[in-house]
């Protein structure tokens, strides 16, 4: 049937244009979600849920308000907060920091997303380390001398932060062989760090 009514013709044209624009927007958005949240690690794909939003900034400020800019105090306070959140395996996609806090549980992915986000908004250099079936956070604390072994990535010292061990301390011992390390990731740029040299000493 031919459409003789001009109004209906223009309406259908308008609806078609809106549909096409919406479709293009969804494809464009999906591309950036994949680009910014998914990283290929060998045979698997890592999905990050890190945030630098107002919620994370306010929470980090609140948790470190009594530290007076003391870095060890800030990092340990944030680590204590995250490690006291109950560990529970999450069979779905990793949760955002806010979801971990509100639901009061998470696995290593979830709790590491929370910790690394809190540290990042305070300006710390932090990365994820992926090992078989686990993930942990590493932090560079500049010239602070802690009497603990550290992971040296390209000759730069990083202390291990373990989110699944209740009240663990900065400089948690490496429980894996160096050869088990699948990747070191900057989740805020969603890219793997090129590793030329890796030591634990």
Where are the predicted features?
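A structural boundary/capping signal
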Residues: 1-201
């Amino acid at each position: 049937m031919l459409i003789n009514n001009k109004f209906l013709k223009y309406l259908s044209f308008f609806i078609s244009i809106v549909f096409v624009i919406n479709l293009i927007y969804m494809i464009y958005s999906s591309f950036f979600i994949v680009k910014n949240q998914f990283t290929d690690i060998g045979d698997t794909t890592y999905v990050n849920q890190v945030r630098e939003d107002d919620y994370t900034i306010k929470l980090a400020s609140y948790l470190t308000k009594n530290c007076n800019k003391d870095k060890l105090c800030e990092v340990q306070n944030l680590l204590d907060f995250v490690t006291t959140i109950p560990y529970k395996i999450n069979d779905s996609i990793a949760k955002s920091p806010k979801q971990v806090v509100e639901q009061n549980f998470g696995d290593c992915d979830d709790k590491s997303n929370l910790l690394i986000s809190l540290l990042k908004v305070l300006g710390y250099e932090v990365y994820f380390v992926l090992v078989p079936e686990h993930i942990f956070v590493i932090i560079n604390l500049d010239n602070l001398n802690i009497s603990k072994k550290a992971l040296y990535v390209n000759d730069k010292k990083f202390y291990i932060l373990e989110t699944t061990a209740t009240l663990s301390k900065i400089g948690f011992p490496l429980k894996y062989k160096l050869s088990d390390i699948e990747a070191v990731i900057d989740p805020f740029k969603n890219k793997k760090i090129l590793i030329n040299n890796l030591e634990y000493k």
